């Protein structure tokens, strides 16, 4: 079964907790993340069947009201993305290292999904605004050409929306840098 991913971002932590509760009660979805992020925002990320995620998002948005900053629905999310949000993907040997930084939390998730669908890479992490002053970043690994293609695909998507901060491909990262990231 192909899963959908839904995400909402709010500027109120109490309202975010309430919206997350409403999202979970509205439909049979799986909670990926429900947490406070920088700077004083709150995110809720769920996965499930498309109709369930749509119902869940609708309920969350209704509760969030004017506190809603952004929302996202990806109907056919790659399985690596939800795990990367929680930094729990099995990485194995790290080849080339790629990183993208965004100004938007929702667009980081979209960029990660685009990158992993564009090339044969493994997502290491999709860090959503925790300790980053409201930014997000995506790390990935694979062979050099694949990481370059993934970064290019994700970056082009971000540039259209004007929310890409920076990106890099490191063909042979130092083992201590790899250890710090995985």
Model-predicted regions and their roles:
Residues 36-51:
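N-terminal interaction modules that seed assembly of large macromolecular complexes
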């Amino acid at each position: 079964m192909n899963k959908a991913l839904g995400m909402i971002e709010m500027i109120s932590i109490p309202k975010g907790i309430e919206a997350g509760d409403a999202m979970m009660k509205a439909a049979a979805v799986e909670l990926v993340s429900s947490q406070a992020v920088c700077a004083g925002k709150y995110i809720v990320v769920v996965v499930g069947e498309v109709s369930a995620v749509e119902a869940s998002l609708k309920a969350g948005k209704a509760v969030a009201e004017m506190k809603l900053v952004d929302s996202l629905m990806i109907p056919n999310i790659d399985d690596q993305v939800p795990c990367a949000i929680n930094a729990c993907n099995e990485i194995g040997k790290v080849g080339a290292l790629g990183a993208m930084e965004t100004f938007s939390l929702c667009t980081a998730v979209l960029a990660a999904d685009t990158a992993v669908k564009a090339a044969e890479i493994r997502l290491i992490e999709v860090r959503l605004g925790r300790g980053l002053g409201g930014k997000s970043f995506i790390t990935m690994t694979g062979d050099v050409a694949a990481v370059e293609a993934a970064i290019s695909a994700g970056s082009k998507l971000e540039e259209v929306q004007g929310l890409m901060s920076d990106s890099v491909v490191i063909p042979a990262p130092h083992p201590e840098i790899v250890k710090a990231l995985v």
